[in-house]
């Protein structure tokens, strides 16, 4: 079964491909099939993920899965949330994972409350007008470190410390990260939903 991943993020694609492989599902990055990205005008992860999934399904005629994920920092009242990917741009930096981490560390200097949640919402649709989308959510609580730690992963992985594991996501072996990350948790739920409802 082929499913479009409604993302151009190669890090997400690699993570999700590895986790979906046992199902016999081939995930194809939308950028390999068409140009352009869905608008993400909403203030919740689930609405943006649904918008992206419907857009990719409409453009390709294939089932689609979209992820909308982000960091919700306690000190910032849950922000940056759905604007996580563009976090650094409000501080004059060009959009990139590296600049996002730099901006976050700068903004968190001297802040005692370092609690944060990483949230991932996956939405799957069989077609652009699917009335019954699959929805899976994963959430992990952690703390923002004061400096980068580790070289694995992408995004905020080098500064997202998980106390019960004693490591940042960037310090973890990929298999450990998949088992404990927000995206890993949401993906495991989505795999079960796809297995139950889409794979025959």
Swiss-Prot record:
Mg(2+) binds at residue 68. One of its GO terms (biological process) is purine nucleoside triphosphate catabolic process. Its EC number is 3.6.1.66. Gene3D superfamilies: 3.90.950.10. Transmembrane segments: none annotated. The active site is at 68 (proton acceptor). It catalyses: XTP + H2O = XMP + diphosphate + H(+); dITP + H2O = dIMP + diphosphate + H(+); ITP + H2O = IMP + diphosphate + H(+). One of its GO terms (molecular function) is metal ion binding. Substrate binds at residues 7-12, 69, 154-157, 177, 182-183. The keyword Ligase does not apply. It is an enzyme of class 3 (hydrolase). Pfam families: Ham1p_like. It comes from the Bacteria. InterPro entries: dITP/XTP_pyrophosphatase (IPR020922), ITPase-like_fam (IPR029001), RdgB/HAM1 (IPR002637). Keywords: Hydrolase, Magnesium, Metal-binding, Nucleotide metabolism, Nucleotide-binding. Its cofactor is Mg(2+). GO terms for cellular component: cytosol. Binds 1 Mg(2+) ion per subunit. Pyrophosphatase that catalyzes the hydrolysis of nucleoside triphosphates to their monophosphate derivatives, with a high preference for the non-canonical purine nucleotides XTP (xanthosine triphosphate), dITP (deoxyinosine triphosphate) and ITP. Seems to function as a house-cleaning enzyme that removes non-canonical purine nucleotides from the nucleotide pool, thus preventing their incorporation into DNA/RNA and avoiding chromosomal lesions. Belongs to the HAM1 NTPase family. HAMAP family: Non_canon_purine_NTPase. Homodimer. This is dITP/XTP pyrophosphatase. It comes from Delftia acidovorans (strain DSM 14801 / SPH-1).
């Amino acid at each position: 079964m082929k499913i479009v991943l409604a993302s151009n993020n190669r890090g997400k694609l690699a993570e999700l491909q590895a986790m979906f492989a046992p199902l016999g599902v081939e995930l194809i990055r939308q950028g390999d099939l068409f140009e352009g990205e869905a608008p993400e005008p909403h203030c919740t992860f689930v609405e943006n993920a649904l918008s992206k999934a419907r857009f990719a399904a409409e453009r390709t005629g294939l089932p689609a899965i979209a992820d909308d994920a982000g960091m919700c920092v306690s000190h910032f009242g849950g922000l940056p949330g759905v604007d996580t990917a563009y976090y650094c741009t409000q501080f004059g930096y060009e959009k990139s994972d590296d600049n996002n981490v730099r901006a976050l560390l700068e903004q968190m200097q001297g802040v005692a409350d370092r609690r944060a949640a990483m949230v991932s919402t996956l939405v799957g649709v069989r077609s652009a007008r699917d009335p019954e989308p699959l929805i899976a959510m994963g959430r992990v609580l952690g703390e923002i470190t004061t400096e980068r730690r580790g070289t694995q992963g992408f995004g905020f992985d080098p500064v997202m410390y998980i106390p019960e594991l004693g490591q940042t996501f960037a310090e973890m072996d990929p298999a450990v990260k998949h088992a404990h990350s927000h995206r890993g948790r949401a993906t495991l739920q989505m795999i079960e939903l796809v297995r139950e409802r889409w794979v025959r």
